[in-house]
Amino acid sequence: MNETLELIRSRSNLARPSTEVVVVEEIGSDEDSCPAFGFLRGIRDRALSIEFRFANGNSQAFPYSWLGPMNYNPSAGLLLKFVGDMIYLVLIEGSNLNALVGGAVSLYDRGVQRHRVSWIREMTPQQAESATPGAVVIDRIRIVSHRSDDEPKGADWLESFDRCG
């Protein structure tokens, strides 16, 4: 069989498969992170989805194409609305949620609004306590879903956003 393959290759001018090992060097990741969230470094880069990582190890992700209105209330948190097969409300609670990280990105206005944040992590109490002063700290992430013709149930925490207009 090898002779037949060689004969076909020689008549059709097909090159032999290379046995040379190609080493690919990773130039560098296009993503950076702080303890609370990960983000794309390029100012024009856009993430396709955003993942919410819970302290218990579970996670849930949504495509940025589903992202609708956002509300930022420094005393209540950051509320994101994703609209797909259902409506998903995601509340990110913590402190310094709009603080600059590395002088280039923040969670809200220079991050999620520009689709640069790829993941957000709920921190354990130990991680939150060990954070440097002024750092972004994510205390809790809450997600509730409901149908478009229904109201969300068990989401009393939405009341603080009704007041912020």
Positions of predicted regions on the chain:
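Short aromatic-glycine motifs in intrinsically disordered, low-complexity regions
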Residues: 47-61
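Phosphoinositide-dependent membrane-docking surfaces
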Residues: 63-75
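Glycine-centered tight beta-turn/hairpin loop motif at sheet-sheet or coil-to-beta transitions
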Residues: 55-57, 83-87
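Short, conserved, surface-exposed binding loops centered on an aromatic residue
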Residues: 41-43, 59-60, 70-71
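Helix-rich interaction surfaces within compact, conserved domain-sized segments
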Residues: 3-17, 91-165
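Short acidic, Gly/Pro-enriched loop/turn segments at secondary-structure junctions
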Residues: 73-84
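A short macromolecule-binding patch
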Residues: 61-63, 86-96
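Anionic N-terminal interaction surfaces
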Residues: 3-45
